[in-house]
Amino acid sequence: MTALTLSTAGAATLRADALVVGVAKGVKGPVLAPGSEAVDKAFDGKLAAVLATLGATGAEGELTKLPAASGLKAPVVVAVGLGPVPDKEDAYDAEALRRAAGTAARALTGSKKAGFALPAASVEDAAAVAEGALLGAYAFTAYQGGENKLAPKDAKSKGNGPKLPLAEVALLGAKPRDKAYKAAVERSLALVEEINRARDLVNTPPNDLYPESFAAVATAAGKEHGVKVQVLDEKALVKGGFGGILGVGQGASRGPRLVKLAYTHPKAEKTLALVGKGITYDSGGISLKPAGHNETMKCDMAGAAAVFAAVVTAARLGLKVNVTGWLALAENMPSGNATRPGDVLRMYSGKTVEVLNTDAEGRLVLADALTRASEEKPDAIVDVATLTGAMVLALGNRTFGVMANDDAFRTSLHEIAEEVGEPSWPMPLPADLRKGMDSPTADIANMGERMGGGLVAGLFLKEFVGEGIAWAHLDIAGPAFHEGAPYGYTPKGGTGSAVRTLVRLAERTAAGDLG
């Protein structure tokens, strides 16, 4: 992963491949952001005018490269847009800083070192720039650049491999010896490392990432970071009566798993349970998805990846809260052994579910995990899942839905998500939609009314949450996997959606700010 340093050098004297400065969109043209003073001085105070001549406006996402002035050690200056000049002087939005830093880091792929002279006068600004740059520098290259066995044996394979991400981010303008700055940057580094691990998991092809191999990754990470890991294999799931997880996974040749991760702090007063949907490949099962809808279904375990990353991050940060993660892992495949539409499953809770559509499988594995998590009486449960296409239709590709059995908890999660830069929107759980899941055969069906499908799924999950436990459901079907061109710090492919929200929730819980 990209290295991060708090540089003691100034922008003018830093030896790097490039210097990054921020430019805001002013009424009369581009306006240089704080942090760019030394670079502007090297241009005799005319950097903004030069950028305007080159067509730069300071709009968000805009990037302009130009040769550095003679007074700078770095050969290139990268000016990145921050959007409109803030109403309050120097009060740049943290998300604007993240996105700008990410845009610059992506543009500097292949470089060894870049100095980031973006606004970093406050601890919060420095952390935002660090996060954005590290997230933007991410690249998934595990399956690229291998040996070409068709090439002549004496040929040298130059330039065949992928360009490596920016190797080092040197943060300028921060205070390297200040404990608060150092702590904030160390937090950013730990957080981004785990977000990128979640991205790697989402991007890994399903022939290599399946329930057993995912469980192995979790086990190894647990040993490294002091997280207890328990893996229930197929035999243990049968013995325990986990009918939902087993029912979804029974059509696959590779069996399902339920993984429990437990981080505990000796002085913790609260326990937070996180539950993640981990369908490592979703074909739809017997209710097979149509052509054109299968290619990205390796991402259907993004909820489990987010939960895994959040628990490990909490452990790495030493948060004073107990955090338990439950990864409900299965492949949803058609076969002679697969669950059929019309089958009835007996869930871990004891309830029976009539399966009307085997492509509504995520709620089945989550239901078992929610019941199991509820048995431990946590103070709150949050589940995360790429659950419904209906949520994507409602909110688009960049916003996740937040549902809950407690309005205050739903509001808190929405506000936390917005605070950390993850767009979200509170969604209702209308009681009148519950009747659509009535079954003449079982206690409940796994499908209901077509309209409001995302809300129906939330109502289904609510049935499996223990009494008196605050619960929220994050449907990340839209933002979990980005199929378009990269933007800001968001890459193509797995995004690590919801990790930042879950970690901030754990921090708030540890601080006693929630409940």
Swiss-Prot record:
Instruction: State where Mn(2+) 2 binds.
Output: 277, 282, 300, 361
Question: Some GO term, biological process aspect, for this entry: which one?
Answer: proteolysis
Cofactor list: Mn(2+)
- Keyword annotations of the record: Aminopeptidase, Cytoplasm, Hydrolase, Manganese, Metal-binding, Protease
- Record: residues binding Mn(2+) 1: 282, 359, 361
Q: Which residues form the active site?
A: 289, 363
Q: Which residues are the signal sequence here?
A: none
Q: What is this protein called?
A: Probable cytosol aminopeptidase
> What species does this protein belong to?
Streptomyces griseus subsp. griseus (strain JCM 4626 / CBS 651.72 / NBRC 13350 / KCC S-0626 / ISP 5235)
